[in-house]
Amino acid sequence: MTNTRKTHPLIKIINHSFIDLPTPSNISAWWNFGSLLGLCLAIQILTGLFLAMHYTSDTMTAFSSVTHICRDVNYGWLIRYMHANGASMFFICLFLHVGRGLYYGSYTYFETWNIGVVLLFVVMATAFMGYVLPWGQMSFWGATVITNLLSAIPYIGTTLVEWIWGGFSVDKATLTRFFAFHFVLPFIVAALVMVHLLFLHETGSNNPSGLISDSDKIPFHPYYTIKDILGVLLLIMALMILVLFSPDLLGDPDNYTPANPLNTPPHIKPEWYFLFAYAILRSIPNKLGGVLALVFSILILTLFPLLHVSKQRSMMFRPLSQCMFWFLVADLLTLTWIGGQPVEHPFIIIGQLASMLYFTIILLMLPTVSLIENKLLKW
């Protein structure tokens, strides 16, 4: 008798993706983040759905509806903080997932990588719009500052900004449409994830050595299902520690003040996971230049497959490239720190140097070091 798992039209798709999937035998814990991102997305969609049941997207009532969720709804505070801190966990996993891809050369899977970059953009857009919804001071001013950047686009900029705002400033129309987009985008993310997995399963997973592993594959279940469960437990533990012990650790106190268009907060800054890009934006005195640098700081990921000149795929056996990679990580941490600092000496110059170094490492130093390593290995 044939196994239903292998013959049923729907179940066999799940079987080929999560059960009988041939997987390299040597993939490390760095390969756990795909499933953890899936879990984060599921948590965000579920908690977001319950929040949307009680939230009102009107400038007069948005802030008080969030207060109502936290005070009056059964476990509303838990749902709200799981959603807010779930976003932070989502981005931690995203950055680690992308970092893994860069370190082990996973970007040579061209389609998978590029859809991943698109996913990163869409998730960032979703998170930005979600931050606007509580309608606190930082929500309002963050939305004003970031949407205003589009006015730097020549000729159509101002019209475009007013079109996005639905008026002449961030107001009711803006909040309503941001809520609509924030609700629908995670489902688009889920669809893109399916495409991401589709392309990944065309080639199979990469592995730490960067070598072809077709001769040494093992089934995904039970080996990697059990390994993923460990990651899931650690992620949920970290999230719940954050939610239950210091839920406001990563938030901004200004967001507990209702939005006031007549009063600008002294330091406007986005959530921590955007600070590196915000620092790059601020480091360029020209508005259009800053916007281009901001976009290119993420878009540069699409260039990695083209800039890969090494004869080896992974950095596992390339100590010089490893050095450059960790320089890049340190630089990104520096940018994140600078993004949260006021615009004054010495932070301005540190931000400019760190921004310049970010692009220099990726566009110049990594390829150069790869060529040197090729020569050292007499290849």
Swiss-Prot record:
SUPFAM superfamilies in the cross-refs: a domain/subunit of cytochrome bc1 complex (Ubiquinol-cytochrome c reductase), Transmembrane di-heme cytochromes
Cofactor: heme b
Binding site for heme b b562: H83, H182
Pfam families tied to this protein: Cytochrom_B_C (PF00032), Cytochrome_B (PF00033)
Primary residence: mitochondrion
Residues that coordinate or bind a ubiquinone: H201
Recorded coiled-coil stretches: none
Any one annotated GO CC term: mitochondrial inner membrane
Cofactor remark from the record: Binds 2 heme b groups non-covalently.
GO molecular function: metal ion binding; ubiquinol-cytochrome-c reductase activity
Known function: Component of the ubiquinol-cytochrome c reductase complex (complex III or cytochrome b-c1 complex) that is part of the mitochondrial respiratory chain. The b-c1 complex mediates electron transfer from ubiquinol to cytochrome c. Contributes to the generation of a proton gradient across the mitochondrial membrane that is then used for ATP synthesis.
Protein name in the entry: Cytochrome b
Organism: Cynomys mexicanus
